[in-house]
Amino acid sequence: VEDWEKLPLPIQYICCSHRRMMQAAHWNEDNYRHYVAAFQHYTRIVARQIESVLEALYSTPAGKNTIVIVLADHGDGMGSHRMVTKQVSFYEEMTNVPFIIAGPGIHPRQKPVEDLLTQPTIDLLPTLCELAGIPVPSSKPGISLAPFLKGEKQKRQHPYAASEWHSEYEVTVSPGRMIRSPRYKYTHYLEGNGEELYDMLKDKGERRNLAHDPKYSKILAEHRALLDDYIRRTQDDYRSLKVEADKRWRSHAPG
């Protein structure tokens, strides 16, 4: 990572964000290899179990009128940026989650969909309403994915996706928000007013923070505006939240 000291404070002190991160701070390469191998092993087990449940369900009459959704609240560090589990960061490994929908009338696909920028937490309600034939509440900010799921063409309608963080076990409260546009990722943390900006086309590993680069000031301003838009549309109280960083986790040198 370039210019570590220019990263937001919660990232500089990410070793103290989770007890497993504290343990991993002393790992060597073999430890990380074992961790990733175990994670992949457990993922394959879960995938087989999901397949078994779906096969059992759709072999019964109830399967003709049942929609199944597989969703997660977060990803896993997978050793990226030397991180494990999940924590305060918004790197791709942490924010990418499974979002699988199966059921009658849903068009099966052989490969994961990569061209649709979705926000599962707010798109889920209108999607389920439309699939169930229930009126979609007009006051909700999400977009129904039902046409796409049925095999119809549906262009990307969200200009961005968003993610949120508040605290880890209420030990250190360091709220943050992420805005992911088709090309760039912007993050903001209340602690120290920290920001990150990554070009996800040229820097998929999120190694170079562009938030302090004058060449990207316009793009930075655009993504700040997108965050303001998200806060307004979702009535997010982000700006009024308080940072409570335990001094124990900010007492050593960053990194």
For each feature predicted by the language model, list its residue ranges.
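Active-site-proximal cap/lid insertion segments
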Residues: 1-118, 131-139, 188-191, 206-207, ...
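Exposed, low-complexity/repetitive linear segments and helix-based recognition motifs
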Residues: 2, 200-203, 225
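Charged catalytic carboxylate motif
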Residues: 45, 49, 123, 127, ...
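Solvent-exposed, non-membrane alpha-helical residues enriched in polar/charged side chains
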Residues: 51-54, 58, 146, 224, ...
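C-terminal cap/loop subdomain of S1 sulfatases and analogous C-terminal strand-loop tails that border
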Residues: 74-80, 107, 122-125, 130-196, ...
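A short, conserved beta-to-alpha structural element at the edge of catalytic cores
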Residues: 98, 102, 227-235
